[in-house]
C-alpha cells in the first residue's frame, strides 16, 4: 500500500470534556469524543461517538443506520443517522476546499503497531478469540487478513470501526474465533500506506512448562536445607559472639 499515490486527508474531531462529577471526595472526569472523517481516494467516511476510549455507536454510512456497540445502549438513547450523513457531506465539501488551498499536499503516513493476543487464557480444545490490536496509525486505512497455517481465514472474523486516540492517530481491533490446537498457528497480517510491506504477527499455542513433581520436591528440599543451614550458622555466630564478649568482660573484671 506504500506505493499508492498521494493521499489527501482531513480529520474532523469534536471533543467535549464533561463537567466534573463529584461523589463524596472523589473527582471524576469523563470524555466524550465525536470523531468523523471523509477519506480520499476511497470516497468513504466514518462517524462515531467514543466515551473514555470505548465506542458508544457508529453510523453505517452506506446503510444510513446507527449501530450501537451494545444493544442495551439503544434502550436509553437514540441517534438519527441522517445527522451523521449531513456532517460527512460537510466534511467532503471542506476537504475539497482544503485540497485546493494545500495544492493537493498529502498528509503524512504513520505506520501501525500490531499486537496479537488471546481474549482469555488458552486451553486446548476450548473455544477462544484471538485479538489483533492495531494501534498508533494514520490515515485510518488498513487491510487485515487472518491466516491459519499460512492460509486465509474468512469465517469467524469481526472488527471494530476506527477508534480515535488523544494524539489524533487511530486504533482498531480485529477478532477471530478459533479452537486452540498444537497443530495450528495463526497470523494477523496488516497492510497500511505507512508500511513498505505487510506486517505479520504470529500466534501459536505454548504449553505451560511445569516442573515434574520429583524436581519440585528436590527444589523444596534444597530450599529448606539452605534455610536450615543459614539458621544454624547464624545461631553459631551469635553464640560465639556472646561467649567472646563474656570472656572479655571477665578479663576486664579481673583487672
Curated annotation (Swiss-Prot):
Disulfide bonds join 132-188. Residues 204-216 are annotated as: Connecting peptide. Gene3D superfamilies: Class II Histocompatibility Antigen, M Beta Chain, Chain B, domain 1 (3.10.320.10), Immunoglobulins (2.60.40.10). It holds the Pfam family MHC_II_alpha. Its main location: membrane. It is found in: Membrane. SUPFAM superfamilies: Immunoglobulin, MHC antigen-recognition domain. Keywords: Adaptive immunity, Disulfide bond, Glycoprotein, Immunity, Membrane, MHC II, Signal, Transmembrane, Transmembrane helix. Residues 1-25 form the signal peptide. GO terms for biological process: antigen processing and presentation of exogenous peptide antigen via MHC class II; immunoglobulin mediated immune response; positive regulation of immune response. Residues 26-216 are extracellular. Residues 243-255 are cytoplasmic. Residues 110-203 are annotated as: Alpha-2. It is a single-pass type I membrane protein. The chain crosses the membrane at residues 217-242. Residues 112-204 form the Ig-like C1-type domain. Glycans are attached at residue 143. Residues 26-109 are annotated as: Alpha-1. It comes from the Eukaryota. CDD domains: IgC1_MHC_II_alpha_I-EK (cd21005). GO terms for cellular component: external side of plasma membrane; lysosome; MHC class II protein complex; plasma membrane. Belongs to the MHC class II family. This is H-2 class II histocompatibility antigen, E-D alpha chain. The gene is H2-Ea.
Amino acid at each position: 500500500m506504500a506505493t499508492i499515490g498521494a493521499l489527501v486527508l482531513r480529520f474532523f474531531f469534536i471533543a467535549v470534556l464533561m463537567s466534573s462529577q463529584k461523589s463524596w471526595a472523589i473527582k471524576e472526569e469523563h470524555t466524550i469524543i465525536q470523531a468523523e472523517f471523509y477519506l480520499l481516494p476511497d470516497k468513504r467516511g466514518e462517524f462515531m461517538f467514543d466515551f473514555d476510549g470505548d465506542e458508544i455507536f457508529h453510523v453505517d454510512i452506506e446503510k444510513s443506520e446507527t449501530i450501537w456497540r451494545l444493544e442495551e445502549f439503544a434502550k436509553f438513547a437514540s441517534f438519527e443517522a441522517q445527522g451523521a450523513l449531513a456532517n460527512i457531506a460537510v466534511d467532503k465539501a471542506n476537504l475539497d476546499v482544503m485540497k485546493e488551498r494545500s495544492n493537493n499536499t498529502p498528509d503524512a503516513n504513520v505506520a501501525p503497531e500490531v499486537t496479537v493476543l488471546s481474549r482469555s487464557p488458552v486451553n486446548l480444545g476450548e473455544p477462544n478469540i484471538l485479538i489483533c490490536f492495531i494501534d498508533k496509525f494514520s490515515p485510518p486505512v488498513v487491510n487485515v487478513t487472518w491466516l491459519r497455517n499460512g492460509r486465509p481465514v474468512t469465517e469467524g472474523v469481526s472488527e471494530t470501526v476506527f477508534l480515535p486516540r488523544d494524539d489524533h492517530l487511530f486504533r482498531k481491533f480485529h477478532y477471530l474465533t478459533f479452537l486452540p490446537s498444537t497443530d495450528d498457528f495463526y497470523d494477523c497480517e496488516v497492510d497500511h500506506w505507512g508500511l513498505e510491506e505487510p506486517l505479520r504477527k504470529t500466534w501459536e499455542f505454548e504449553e505451560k512448562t511445569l516442573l515434574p513433581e520429583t524436581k519440585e520436591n528436590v527444589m523444596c528440599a534444597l530450599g529448606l536445607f539452605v534455610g536450615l543451614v543459614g539458621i544454624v550458622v547464624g545461631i553459631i555466630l551469635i553464640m560465639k559472639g556472646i561467649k567472646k564478649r563474656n570472656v572479655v568482660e571477665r578479663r576486664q573484671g579481673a583487672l
